Amino acid sequence: MSYDETNLPRKVVKYLDEINSDKNLKDAFYYCDVDIYDVNEIIKFQEDQLWFEDMCGPGEPNYDIKPFARDASGGLWVVLNNEKIGYIGTEGECGIVARNIDEFMNVVSTLKSGFISELSDEKSFYKIFEEQNKEYKSSGVLSSFIEKNCFEKDPSKIYHILKLGMTAKPFFLIKGKEGYLDSYSLFGLDDGQKSLEKFIKDYCN
C-alpha cells in the first residue's frame, strides 16, 4: 500500500514509499531513531485526533501536525503545515528540526542519528557526526540513499542545514490549556530556552 493513501504531502510520500519498499533501508532509518509508521498507522492518526491530547494534554499547537514516524522514546516526527519537519517529545518538548523533508532526510541519513536535540553547538555536532559514522553498521544502504537523492555530505554544510531548520520561524509551540504548561525547547526544560536563544544568536552572528 502506498503512502498516497494518506494525507501527507507528495514529497513526504515519495520518501516514505522509497524507504518502506526496501527493508534494509527501513531498518537503517530505524537504527537512526526514525521508525517510519506504516500507511494504516498514519491513517489512524488522521482519523482520530485524540492522539494529540493523549500525548500532549489539552493544548493548542501553532501548526497543523501530521505524524509520520516515531523515535525509541515514543516521541513523534511530524510534518508541520505540509512543509516543515518537527519533533514532539514525550516530556513536553517540541520544535522544528528541518525546513522541509529533503533537509530532514539529508541530516538524518548523513548524521545517522535522530538525536537532533543534542546538537546545540557545533562542537557537539562534529563529535556526534564522527562517532555515528564510525560506529554505524548499515552505511552502505544509506550511502546509496544519499547518492540517489544528491544529498549534501560535508559536515559543516549539514550543520548549516540543521541550524536553518532549528532557527526557522515561527517556532513550533504548543500552548497549554486547562492548567497544562506550554511546550518547551528541544534543548531542555531548565536552560533549554537559553540554549536555543544562544544557538540562534551564534547562527546569526
What are these regions, as identified by a protein language model?
Residues 1-83, 87, 122-123, 136-205:
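A surface-exposed partner-binding patch
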Residues 125-135:
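Hydrophobic alpha-helical interaction segments
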Residues 86-126:
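Compact, glycine/acidic-enriched structural inserts
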